[in-house]
Regions:
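A structural signal for isolated positions on well-ordered beta-strands in alpha/beta enzyme cores
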Residues: 19, 85, 113-115
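Active-site diphosphate/adenylate-binding microenvironment
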Residues: 25, 33-35
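Short glycine-rich phosphate-binding loop at a beta-alpha junction
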Residues: 15-26
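Short, glycine/charge-rich flexible loops or terminal/linker lids adjacent to PRPP-binding catalytic cores
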Residues: 39-85, 95, 122-132
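A phosphate-binding catalytic loop at a beta-strand-loop-alpha-helix junction
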Residues: 84-104
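Conserved hydrophobic/aromatic pocket- or pore-lining residues that grip, position, or stack substrates
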Residues: 8, 20, 34, 112
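PRPP-dependent phosphoribosyltransferase catalytic core
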Residues: 102-195
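Short, small-residue-biased leader/transition segments that mark boundaries at the very start
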Residues: 2-3
Length: 195
């Protein structure tokens, strides 16, 4: 994990920002490591409501939107007037990222540079995460630039699949949601219907 966050910061040598923040809780270690590697101060810029669960797994868009509004609050005294690097672990549907960027800008952030500590999710996960079709995944529908525009980030960068392999040494790593290469044969209803 330490190496992973160093790799993400390594590519941003020309990025000038005032602070680095992480989206609680899953990306805090990546944000701290990014800040150390980039030489940019880490700050707590978002406070999490501990009584709201994972937003991207809510069954409807309306529920996801409501959960995001309840889940995170920006710390205005930390973000106001600052150019921010915001680290998150992934972008699944884009709902959470879009709302967080807007929250930070509404709280006075001058710029929000989003860095994602995983590759673009382009394929469904059939191993326990509620993303059963590609049409639910923003990464399967849009380019990185289109995602950046959609979430209103000033810049956006994802870790590449190669960087993830390098950071984790590829040991026991499932990359199916990033590259569509599943480690088990998947059942196809369509193939059965076509028989």
């Amino acid at each position: 994990d330490v190496y992973k966050r160093q790799i993400l910061a390594r590519e941003d040598k020309d990025l000038h920002a005032d602070i680095v923040i992480g989206v609680p809780d899953s990306s805090l270690s990546a944000a701290i490591g990014y800040a150390e590697e980039a030489g940019i101060p880490f700050e707590t810029g978002l406070i999490k409501n501990r009584y709201v669960g994972r937003t991207f797994i809510q069954p409807t868009q309306a529920m996801r939107d409501r959960s995001v509004r309840l889940k995170l609050s920006p710390v205005s005294s930390v973000v106001k007037g600052k150019s921010i690097v915001m680290i998150d672990d992934s972008i699944v549907r884009g709902t959470t990222s879009r709302r967080i960027v807007q929250l930070l800008k509404d709280a006075g952030a001058t710029q929000v540079h989003v860095r994602i500590a995983s590759p673009v999710i382009t394929s469904p996960c059939f191993y326990g995460v509620d993303t059963s079709t590609k049409d639910q995944l923003i990464g399967a529908q849009m380019s990185v630039e289109e995602i950046r525009d959609y979430i209103h980030a000033d810049t956006l960068r994802f870790m590449t699949e190669e960087e993830m392999k390098e950071a984790t040494h590829g040991v026991g790593l499932c990359l199916a949601c990033f590259n569509g290469e599943y480690c088990t044969k998947l059942f196809s209803y369509q193939e059965e219907l076509d028989k």
